Amino acid sequence: MQSMADMLSASGGSQQRCTGIALAEVTAIKDPKNHGRVKCRYLTADKNLGETGWIYCLTPFGGKEYGCFFHPGIGDIVALAYEDGDVHRPFVIGSLWAKKNTPPASVSDGKNEIFKLITPNKSYVEFSDAPKKEHITVSTPKGHRIDLDDENDVISVTDGKNKLDISGKSGSVELTCEKKLTIKVGSGVTITCDGNSGAVEIKTNSKIELNSAKIGVKASGEASVEGSGSVTVKSSGVMTIKGSMTKIN
């Protein structure tokens, strides 16, 4: 099959220059040198026109091991330009949507308010720029989401069953867990809330201190206070110990 350069050479183009832009379909992406190059097949009426060699892809920002990495995939439609008009040196300058490669969003209502970055497997970042309804959503195919919602003044993190809501409007934070919540601080403090049994457990290597103007402790069933060392109960006012039967020692 011919290349673009071969075709121009055969037609008498001795300088083999091309000042226009060509459309092509990506056919290979596994660059043997890992330079981010692709191979493309020209989309022309000439079915004998073959594919390019390994060619580079333009990026809006890039340098050594950093930059904006959005690589074309096999089957993507791309636009090719030519370095200094040399048909031997094409490079990808962008992608195009087409009949078989439709865009991930639309402007059907005539309002350009939704901006989206989405992968082929449907992980996405969506920006809504609608007046007074601005929000940013980050989501995976399984529904793990982060929502930054200016309309409702809420930040939400969810996996579908468990959810964290931070409300700037009400000044509240709500954490909802389906089964179990564990909070760990360093290696010495653990707080566990078990949704199945209803138990709450606090463990620490040091001490637990409650300090308030008034503290009430009430159990609908049995209540016990036990210490492996000394236990002190002290009051600067009246102390009342009351029960249907009271045993001391």
Model-derived features: positions:
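Short, structured beta-strand/loop micro-motifs enriched in basic residues and often containing a Trp
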Residues: 54-64
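A generic structural motif
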Residues: 27-30, 44-46, 86, 96
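Alpha-helix capping and helix-loop boundary segments enriched in small/acidic/polar residues
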Residues: 13, 63-67
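Extended Gly/Ser/Thr-rich low-complexity repeat segments
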Residues: 52-54, 151-152
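Residue-level "contact hotspot" at macromolecular interaction interfaces
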Residues: 31-32, 71
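Short aromatic-glycine-enriched beta-strand elements
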Residues: 33-41
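Right-handed beta-helix
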Residues: 1-11, 18, 23, 69, ...
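Catalytic cores of peptidoglycan-degrading enzymes
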Residues: 41-46, 51-52, 75-80
